[in-house]
Amino acid sequence: MKISRRRFILSSAVVGGGLAIGYAATRPSGHRIANDTLAEGSARYLTSFLRIDPDNRVTVYVNHSEMGQGSHTALAMMAADELDAAWEQVRIEQAPATDLYAAGDMAIGFAGEFGVPSFLMPLIEASAMKIAQIGNLQTTGGSASIRFTGQLGMRVAGAAAREMLIQCAAERWGVPADECTTALSYVHHNASGQSLSYGELADAAAGLEPPEAPTLKQHTQF
């Protein structure tokens, strides 16, 4: 696929004391749309596809329909795998019916597979997202949920959140981030024996700028 992960902007937000992180294809107004349509009280959303609550629960918001094909479970697992989340603490919710979750990434993904010249991709991206937003489209079909939302969205969101949580833990402990590891929704510093749950770090992590192109796991790491 010829679409770079760098075309996907990740955002984070404080949601009731937790961390919400999502992705959008070059949509700088995504955070404004979210706050105008979804925010309640002090909660703030920024294209939220992944949420971590203080009690260490992880919620994955999916903008595709589940019709028995297993896409909801698969997409949540792709995010959870990159996040190193404890699966028993992961829940799945259908994304709200707002243009924030419009599935314009499907058209963008197909354009990449069809070999559209790179100089046309910015126009394709802008047009696809605008059409999807106008129709509030949360489309399901063409095996696109896993290929595009999963590979370009859920994996990137999970990897970005993991890096943010590690950064927060490392700063709190005063240790290098590369000395920290993650497993089952916890960040560990083995040298000192310290551990923090994702829920404990979520509020601080929400204040960080998400990495634009986080490092994804190799197949051998799954």
What are these language model-derived features?
Residues 1-222:
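Cofactor-binding beta-sheet edge motifs in enzyme active sites
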